[in-house]
Swiss-Prot record:
Pfam families, A to Z: Arg_decarb_HB, Arg_decarbox_C, Orn_Arg_deC_N
Residues bearing PTM N6-(pyridoxal phosphate)lysine: K128
Domain of life: Bacteria
Listed GO MF terms: arginine decarboxylase activity; metal ion binding
The name this protein goes by in its record: Biosynthetic arginine decarboxylase
Native organism: Yersinia pestis
Cofactor(s) for this UniProt protein: Mg(2+); pyridoxal 5'-phosphate
Keyword 4Fe-4S: no
Organism phylogeny: Bacteria, Pseudomonadati, Pseudomonadota, Gammaproteobacteria, Enterobacterales
Gene that encodes the chain: speA
Length: 659
């Protein structure tokens, strides 16, 4: 780690507390507690994220060492000031990865001890969740038992290269050709326990042929296609219509083929997969019970299954609602481990069978928490209100009607409902827009009507009561209509593709200002030229809203924003819409003495990098631009300036940069 990429300093989040009155501290503590509730940090944060007494987000990468924490807002600003850190950037906490791994292993250890389970347990990390070197190496160097899973040839090569650090279990999923199969068998020859999971019947013939050529006894697994299926956004990866796995008939055929080839002893692993991000613990229990029946029946057929791979599905609570919604879970690590271990052990005990080694492929649960995308707001559009002025004499009827509604609202004795005022003003505004489109009103008329309508909405909003059920739909409608628009320096398609593709919710909140109660609502928009580049769902207390609660902020100097729990899938699924590339990335290590070490692991893609992806040679582009400039009658100094700017842009960041 070079000195240029290192920050080592104490960060004491409460350094200024002694300068404030105890009353102010108590008030800010109450506000911080309210903001914790508003954004549900206590539940999705997993004890890794918190709001400190300054109202800033703090990060504790290892909750077992509470004194090791860092103020994220202070860290980012220090790096911007001292190192010129560009935003957006991923702030990655490898210590969170290692703590997640330890926590899952510990949960299964407790479950095995609690239920007298005699088999072992292995967490196998499916690298498809996040293949970055920093992630894989942080996990394999953690000192914890860990296996690796590959789903393609490229992933298999990465896994084989890193497996030397663990000498552990390798699970090979996905569709396979002979090259993939040979790589797996070579891994077995090198001393690893490599399980080739049969996903389709045509693979078994190739496996046996290549094993004979390499003179190695293969370890085989079979993926059974269950009738059980989880619910949610990823339910299609499980169930009878799943893309992967063998039906009951095909499982029997596989056993017969292996028996005829005198290779039945090679079939050692049973695998199933209910789906990713399983929200309901009942779905997990049901799937484990059904798969345990496969284990029992295979033993009856003489198959000595030694490993029981329950696949992925261990979810994380993106919302913090602790519910069965698609982006939440109604269980924790301990309950998950208990259900898996008890379900398998109960079936084994009932039929007098040995307890197999349990494998889980819990990639999302390991990686999601460890990465935060931090970015800056580049523009704010917010509604400003001034005292409405009456329309000019002889104004069109639609304008007069809007003004009448406003005046009625100022009369204390008026008993018309808030809903009625809203509907009347909406109809009047619709009339204004229609008449404007037909040339009956001018632009000044339209602007006056729209501003008065906003004032009416603002007045109605002040009088609404969230505890009144009848008011809630109106509250939601007006919050969307009146929300500030924050234009954020990032690409939704590159950094949070699941938010765009499947409406997944990620926790988003300011990194500072959280010692003040929320006063405004906002929606976040990215900088792509695409109307889909907006975040549509936000955490709001124990629910989800279409706007984000915001503490008071200066629109000329808005706070930094953090997009949390983006460590699983988002980096690798991100696409290049508008040629926005990978963001910069840093690894952050936090120590009990208050020091923080930061290593720049990725500078982020340049414009030239992205152009080359689409076969646009940067040097040729520069040459073409130079030719255009030389053909002009601009003076030599100006030509040189334009060429310098173009070349600097080619090798600059794809995102917006301050001068």
């Amino acid at each position: 780690m070079s000195d240029d990429n290192l920050i080592s300093r104490p960060l004491t989040a409460g350094a200024h507390v002694s300068l404030r009155s105890m009353q102010e501290v108590a008030m800010n503590d109450r506000n911080a507690s309210k903001m914790l509730s508003t954004y549900n940090v206590a539940y999705w944060g997993g004890n890794y994220y918190d709001v400190n007494e300054l109202g800033h987000i703090s990060v504790c990468p290892d909750p077992d060492i509470r004194e090791a924490r860092v103020d994220l807002a202070q860290l980012v600003k220090k790096m911007q000031l001292e190192q010129g850190q560009r935003l957006p950037a991923l702030f990655c906490f490898p210590q969170i990865l290692q703590h997640r791994l330890r926590s899952i292993n510990a949960a299964f250890k407790r479950a095995r001890e609690s239920f007298g389970y005699e088999g072992g347990y292995f967490l196998v990390y499916p690298i498809k969740v996040n293949q970055h070197r920093r992630v894989i190496e942080s996990l394999v160097n953690s000192g914890e038992p860990l296996g690796l899973e590959a789903g393609s040839k490229a992933e298999m090569m990465a896994v084989l290269a890193h497996a030397g650090m663990t000498r552990s279990v390798i699970v090979c999923n996905g569709y396979k050709d002979r090259e993939y199969i040979r790589l797996a068998l070579i891994g077995e020859k090198l001393g690893h326990k490599v399980y080739l999971v049969i996903e389709k019947m045509s693979e078994i013939k190739m496996v046996l042929e290549e094993a004979e050529r390499l003179n190695v006894v293969p370890r085989l697994g079979v993926r059974a296609r269950l009738a059980s299926q989880g619910s949610g956004k990823w339910q299609a990866s499980g169930g009878e219509k799943s893309k992967f796995g063998l039906s009951a008939t095909q499982v029997l055929q596989l056993v017969d083929m292996l028996r005829e080839a005198n290779s039945l002893e090679s079939l050692q692993l049973l695998h199933f997969h209910l789906g990713s991000q399983l929200s309901n613990i009942r779905d997990i229990s049901t799937g484990v019970r059904e798969s345990a029946r496969f284990y029992v029946e295979l033993h009856k057929l003489g198959v000595n299954i030694q490993c029981f791979d329950v696949g992925g599905g261990l979810g994380v609570d993106y919302e913090g609602t602790r519910s069965q919604s698609d982006c939440s879970v109604n269980y924790g690590l301990n309950e998950y481990a208990n259900n898996v271990i008890w379900g398998i052990g109960d079936a084994c005990n009932e039929h007098g069978l040995p307890h197999p080694t349990v494998i889980t492929e819990s990639g999302r649960a390991v990686t999601a928490h460890h990465t935060v995308l931090v970015s800056n707001v580049i523009g704010v559009e917010r509604n400003e209100f001034c005292e409405p002025q009456p329309p000019e004499a002889g104004a069109p009827r639609a304008l007069e009607s809007l003004w009448d509604t406003w005046q009625e609202m100022q009369e204390p004795e008026n008993r018309r409902s808030l809903r009625e005022w809203l509907h009347d003003s909406q109809m009047d505004l619709h009339d204004v827009h229609t008449q404007y489109a037909h040339g009956m009103l001018d632009l000044t008329h339209r602007a006056w009507a729209e501003q008065l309508y906003l004032s009416i909405c603002n007045e109605i909003q002040k009088q609404l009561d969230p505890s009144n059920r009848a008011h809630r739909p109106i509250i939601d409608e007006l919050q969307e209509r009146m929300a500030d628009k924050l234009y954020v320096n990032f690409s939704l398609f590159q950094s949070m593709p699941d938010a765009w593709g499947i409406d997944q919710l990620f926790p988003v909140l300011p990194l500072e200002g959280l010692d003040k109660p929320p006063e405004r609502r906002a929606v976040l928009l990215d900088i792509t030229c695409d109307s889909d580049g907006t975040i549509d769902h936000y955490i709001d207390g124990d629910g989800v809203a279409t706007t984000m609660p915001m503490p008071p902020y200066d629109p000329e100097n808005p706070p930094l924003l953090g997009f949390f729990m983006v460590g699983a899938y988002q980096e690798i699924l991100g696409n290049m819409h508008n040629l926005f590339g990978d963001t910069a990335a840093v690894d952050v290590y936090v120590f009990p003495d208050g020091t923080v070490e930061v290593e720049q692991t990725d500078e982020g893609d340049t414009v030239a990098d992205m152009l080359e992806y689409v076969q646009l040679n940067p040097e040729k582009l520069l040459e073409h631009f130079r030719g255009q400039v030389k053909e002009t009658d601009l003076d030599t100094e100006l030509q040189a300036q334009f060429l310098e700017e173009f070349e600097a842009g080619l090798y600059g960041y794809t995102y917006l940069e301050d001068e």
